[in-house]
From Swiss-Prot:
Assigned keywords, A-Z: Repressor, Ribonucleoprotein, Ribosomal protein, RNA-binding, rRNA-binding, Translation regulation, tRNA-binding
Subunit structure as annotated in this protein's UniProt entry: Part of the 50S ribosomal subunit.
Originating species: Aquifex pyrophilus
Name under which the protein is recorded: Large ribosomal subunit protein uL1
CDD domains per UniProt: Ribosomal_L1
GO molecular function, one term: rRNA binding
Family matches, as SUPFAM superfamilies: Ribosomal protein L1
């Protein structure tokens, strides 16, 4: 019952570990796992409605950077094709991918 729903602890998801101290540090730093569905869509939280604009932007750029850095070496072509943000159970808002990636590069420089 719990396994298919993703509720069982698992080494793959990082919920079972031999290094408890590191797991606690990661959790306190705000480590977020992202999941990919069968269509290749990535689902991950980037903040809460209560966050201010600057904090949300920082989180969005950090999330996109994490996805770009996770690109497998053998993957060819454009890795991120579009970005859409939404609240839980609300319509999404499309984000300009080219401008977002450009700003991400500017922030890294």
């Amino acid at each position: 019952i719990l396994g298919p729903r993703g509720l069982m602890p698992s080494p793959k998801t990082g919920t079972v570990t031999k290094n408890v101290e590191q797991a606690i540090k990661d959790a306190k730093r705000g480590r977020v796992e992202f999941k990919v569905d069968k269509a290749g869509n990535i689902h991950m939280p980037v903040g809460k409605v209560s966050f201010d604009k600057a904090k949300l932007l920082d989180n969005i750029y950090a999330a996109i950077d994490a996805v770009v850095r996770a690109k497998p070496p053998g993957a060819k072509g454009q890795y991120v094709k579009n970005i859409a943000l939404s609240l839980t159970m609300s319509p999404s808002v499309k984000i300009d991918i080219n401008e977002t990636l450009r700003k991400l590069q500017e922030r890294a420089a």
